[in-house]
Curated annotation (Swiss-Prot):
The gene is hscA. Belongs to the heat shock protein 70 family. NCBIfam families: HscA (TIGR01991), PRK05183.1 (NF003520). It comes from Salmonella paratyphi C (strain RKS4594). HAMAP family: HscA. Keywords: ATP-binding, Chaperone, Nucleotide-binding. One of its GO terms (biological process) is iron-sulfur cluster assembly. Chaperone involved in the maturation of iron-sulfur cluster-containing proteins. Has a low intrinsic ATPase activity which is markedly stimulated by HscB. Involved in the maturation of IscU. This is Chaperone protein HscA. GO terms for molecular function: ATP binding; ATP hydrolysis activity; ATP-dependent protein folding chaperone; unfolded protein binding. The keyword Hydrolase does not apply. PROSITE patterns: HSP70_1, HSP70_2, HSP70_3. Signal peptide: none annotated.
Amino acid sequence: MALLQISEPGLSAAPHQRRLAAGIDLGTTNSLVATVRSGQAETLPDHEGRHLLPSVVHYQQQGHTVGYAARDNAAQDTANTISSVKRMMGRSLADIQARYPHLPYRFKASVNGLPMIDTSAGLLNPVRVSADILKALAARASESLSGELDGVVITVPAYFDDAQRQGTKDAARLAGLHVLRLLNEPTAAAIAYGLDSGKEGVIAVYDLGGGTFDISILRLSRGVFEVLATGGDSALGGDDFDHLLADYIREQAGIADRSDNRVQRELLDAAIAAKIALSDADTVRVNVAGWQGEITREQFNDLISALVKRTLLACRRALKDAGVEPQDVLEVVMVGGSTRVPLVRERVGEFFGRTPLTAIDPDKVVAIGAAIQADILVGNKPDSEMLLLDVIPLSLGLETMGGLVEKVIPRNTTIPVARAQDFTTFKDGQTAMSIHVMQGERELVQDCRSLARFALRGIPPLPAGGAHIRVTFQVDADGLLSVTAMEKSTGVEASIQVKPSYGLTDGEIASMIKDSMSFAEQDVKARMLAEQKVEAARVLESLTGALTADAALLSAAERQCIDDAAAHLSAVAQGDDVDAIEQAIKNVDKQTQEFAARRMDQSVRRALKGHSVDEV
């Protein structure tokens, strides 16, 4: 009998055949694609030897161009040349226009408030534009590797929310790519440096790209990459340096008109060129719109100093979350082209007390790490023992009675992760339960962020507390959340995948974390009060049902005592005295003990009625 050949689902039937995989750094300003060849990770250049691909797409009626050719058209055809589209991913049109009021594009809102860009090629959304960039990178990889890609790992900022991550996945699928995984950019850098240098200990990854800033505190130990804490700002990067310098040049040149898109582009191009030159020189000559002048590195440093300080404040918060001090950090990895700015390297070095690592090209390190991870995930390194653990930035939980938040997965828990908790019904005969998914660090619903709501129906009508509902939170490797609620006796269940239409800003995330610390004592007191009020309501509801059913078991005097105790509890439960509510609950319990005993005796007699002692 011949053997039946089998293989793992999704893997090649020829187990020793090398599969083609790539890592893609889908950046705000520039993008790269990398792969592993002969055991070495390397970025793939275009025909002219250029490794970076400008994240720019120029649209025309007859087609589109991506990269350098598109960027060269920016000044002549600004409205049809889309750049920094990553900043628009997962955001509403209102949010984009509030954040970036000077974007030179013709926007229209879709039916759900998401942005559509009106171009010569028609209405396009950020997902489509990102897909065109990904197609160009995939084509470069396929040509270089002489074959179609079996899978890719695409990097995203650590603080990208669910909508932004899902948008990135959608763009990849639109580009015809099989996504092996989305990988946080700082984590990709840790993979690149961890495998190359073999360092063990705490590492800070300072990632300042064109449009985003991320700081990650990682522990590297024996091949395990664990993210201890993350922080950052998804709306801060080298683009902001460029715009500040462009505005400064505008002022020096006396250019008041902001409506001329061609001049806007010339100013921005001049600012970018000056920024790059000032990384090596102390002064640079600028010639734009008929104006000539000189800009010094000191002037540039003054312009960007506040932004650099903002990144260091995020570093301090991340270190606090990780429970480490700056001196505990073994290495500081610099990622992103903007880390070439001398002031950035200087301030980061001063903050951590050590010279930052720049051994791997900061523009390429993320793509290289992604390529290494893709090579493993596609099955080319079955003997690899590398383990990668990312974290969620904010706690996830549920609303419970009294407006309280029950945390199911705490902040900075490594992902992928699944956690479950059991809940029960509050009222007799309750047949449905509303599941309200929350995100945040505070104790009360009003102080946290609502992620989603759904209902579980078909719960059997049992006494309060009789039904058992298991709620499971599952966060996958891409940071996407699924919540499932199941009634255990019947198996009836409902679920939801959380995909916010647009996300939470990193400033709000930092504020939520800060508030949880500032209001910790106040929140604990508020929670204790809410819990006592919920317990008071439960006791009173239960007592009302018991009195309705078995009031005949009480004398008039006993009934009066119970009614008085219940009235007192109802009154104090309206106030804010936790101790008074607790004492009133105890008093009701004391006054109803004999009543409860009689009800129990009566239930036993009813159960035994018509049965002999032998049957019992």
